[in-house]
Amino acid sequence: MIQEQLAFLPESLPDYRPFPPARERTVWQGLPQRVKDRFLQAGEAALQTPIAPLPLSLWLDFTRTGRRTAWEDAYFSRRARLCALVCAECVEHTGRFLGAIADTVWALCEESAWQLPAHNSYIRDTPQLPLPDTTRPIVDLFAAETGALLALTRYLLPDELDTAAPGITVRMEQELNTRILTPYFTSHFWWMG
């Protein structure tokens, strides 16, 4: 089905640029001061906030009790941290936030799964599996959102990230291919219809 749709696309697509990478300073410097201040304030707060741990016990808490909040609070705080740090670095562009960005990217790449425990099943309305299968990633809304956040981070700060942590963008691309693109193109998920 996807192959059939691809036949209708032109040979090459123009570059899609929702906004420029951080190295293109004119647009970032031209943001309203209140927006830049808000981004910097959030980034500075994120620098002071450690990366939330995601131990197995939090995943198993959902498996055993159905409680979602402990896992999800830590999971979403990691992603909010990365978003705040990236926006702050794009505005300031001095490298002050890059170490924390690299640490947070690494933490996301090291997660066993990007789907939520409540979505850890391959068939709709069936019980969730007790643990994620790292050899068969599930693409749910939140895994896709994580992939989008990492792709956006790589798009905005590619050279800066590789300067701060050589090779980290390669790892990001590997995880995106393994966890999002390959499963999307080779597996069927219930939400695909």
Language-model region placement:
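Active-site lining segments of carbohydrate-active enzymes
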Residues: 129-193
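Extreme N-terminal leader/anchor segments
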Residues: 1-39, 87-90, 97
